[in-house]
Every structure is written in C-alpha cells, then in structure tokens.
Amino acid sequence: MKKLVIATRGSQLALWQSNHIKAILQEQNPGLEVELNVIVTTGDRIQDKALSKIGGKGLFLKELEEAMLQGEAQIAVHSLKDVPTVMPDGLILAAITEREDSRDALLSEKYANIDALPKNAVVGTSSLRRRMQIQKLRPDLIIKDLRGNVDTRIRKLKEGEFDAIILAAAGINRLSLLDAVKHVYPISLEEMVPSMGQGALGIEAVNDAEVLRIVAGLEDEYSRIETTIERSFVDELEGGCQVPIGVNASVLDDGTISIRAVLGLPNGEEMLSDSKITSKKDYENIGREIAAEFIEKGAKELLSRAEAMMENK
C-alpha cells in the first residue's frame, strides 16, 4: 500500500490527533503517503442541543465510518472515550495507543479546585457522567450544558458564561492549553471516575490485512488491557453514551490492575460505585464480571431511570 487516508473531524483536537498518528505512521512505514480526509459530522453541526438529547457521542463517528465503508478512507482516529462498544460490520478497533492522562480536569479563571467553588457557582459540562459526579460532590453547584470544541468551551469560560468547566485532561495536554486558563485542576480518580477509554486514541480501520499491518505499530499493550476492561463493563451494562457511567482501569507497577466504576442518576442523588485491585489474568472477562455485580445491585434499573430522567428533561 502506497497511500493511507485518515478520516478525521475538523476540530482542533481531532486534527492534532490525526496529524500525530500520521507522523507516527510515516516514521514507522517509510515511503507511505498519509493523507487526511476532513469530514464535518452530525455532532459538529448540531451545537445547540445537549449530546444526550441528539444521540450521544456516536454522532461524531457516523460520517467517518461511512467514509471508510465507502472506500474514501482506510482508518479514523478517535478519542477512544467517544467510540461505542459495538463496531459496524467491516470495521474494527485495530489499535489503541499509549494512554495520556485519563483524568478529568476542572478549568477556572477564579477558582483553584472543586472545593474553592462558591455556592451556586455555574459549572459547564455536556457529560452526564461528569454532571452526576460533580453534583454528588457539590450539590450546591449549578450545572449547565456546554457544547463546542475545546477552544470554544475555553472562550465561553473566559467570557464569564461559566465559573468553571470540566474537560478531559488529555485534550488539554495534547493541545498545550495548560497556560490558556489560570487554574487547571486535574480531578483525582477518587473524586471523579473518567469515561471508558478516556486518554487513549482508538484507531478504527477497515478489516483489511495490509491496513491492519500498517497500524499494528500504534498498539499499546497496557492501554488495550485497561480499555478492554472498561469497554466490556459498559457493554455488559448496555450503557450507551446517553447514560452516566464512569469506569477506569489502571495497570499498576506491580502488574495488578486497579479498577473503579460508578453509575447512577444524572443529578447525583443515587449512585452505585465500587473499586478493587485484581490481576491481569483473564482480563477480557473482568469488566463483565464487575458489571454483573453492579447488575445484582440494581444497575440496570438505575440506568433506566437515568434515561427516563433525561428524556423528560
């Protein structure tokens, strides 16, 4: 193969990620031409509604997947947290890159951390998972929907529309935005459990042997283990992007895996959570086993109520 086309969204972060992967692929495959095919997705076009109201994060993938299936691209680079657990026929999750910081981060021009926020401070997030957990920590805060790409969200913060906003730490790091806002507070895993796959890039590809050979060098073993656990947990719960679920698996220095999971109602009034240390052995099934424990505690019913809450909002 002489040329590989990457389907990508046109946002600043998406282009950074795709160009980052392009550079690695060209370094690993001398002589390979790599080109970007920039596509505007439904999620990019609809900016005036909450994601949970219009179909969730999958709206950022649909057109990219169609481009691959129609032969207009061979791979797409995604923030793995945005990739549903079920792939369309003909496409596979071919590689998962080394993980950046998996945590969420609180950004503010005035307040250094969550505790410093005054009563009735306005916090912006489009994520039901973040909304649930911040409301559990601080029920006195006002949570408002925040859409747009990273620079749009930061502009809204700087213009005073919000006292603080919550973003993925990885995106801030990738775009070198640590100095763009006065306070950037990485939220600990104890305070807020991230989304499945957060911090890693997922390389979705056509199921073609030559393409898979080219992208194989992007694969990170630990990221695959961690995110397989996280994605299988969400898959077992049948939890799409429109329900509040957080799950994080981290391979520790001694080879064991630390796992945290949380789910509940968007207002934070009812939540199920658990954390445990386990071995890497049989990691493909760990997420499903933990999900089964959550289901025994009433997780499915709680998620159904969460969906109903959002539909009636």
Curated annotation (Swiss-Prot):
GO BP annotation list: protoporphyrinogen IX biosynthetic process
GO molecular function, one term: hydroxymethylbilane synthase activity
Catalytic activity: 4 porphobilinogen + H2O = hydroxymethylbilane + 4 NH4(+)
Cofactor names: dipyrromethane
Gene Ontology annotations for the cellular component aspect, listed alphabetically: cytoplasm
S-(dipyrrolylmethanemethyl)cysteine modification, residue list: 241
Listed pathway(s): Porphyrin-containing compound metabolism; protoporphyrin-IX biosynthesis; coproporphyrinogen-III from 5-aminolevulinate: step 2/4
EC number: 2.5.1.61
Pfam families named in the record: Porphobil_deam (PF01379), Porphobil_deamC (PF03900)
Entry note: cofactor: Binds 1 dipyrromethane group covalently.
Subunit structure: Monomer.
Task of the protein: Tetrapolymerization of the monopyrrole PBG into the hydroxymethylbilane pre-uroporphyrinogen in several discrete steps.
Additional remark text: The porphobilinogen subunits are added to the dipyrromethane group.
Protein's name according to its UniProt entry: Porphobilinogen deaminase
Species assigned in the record: Sulfurimonas denitrificans (strain ATCC 33889 / DSM 1251) (Thiomicrospira denitrificans (strain ATCC 33889 / DSM 1251))
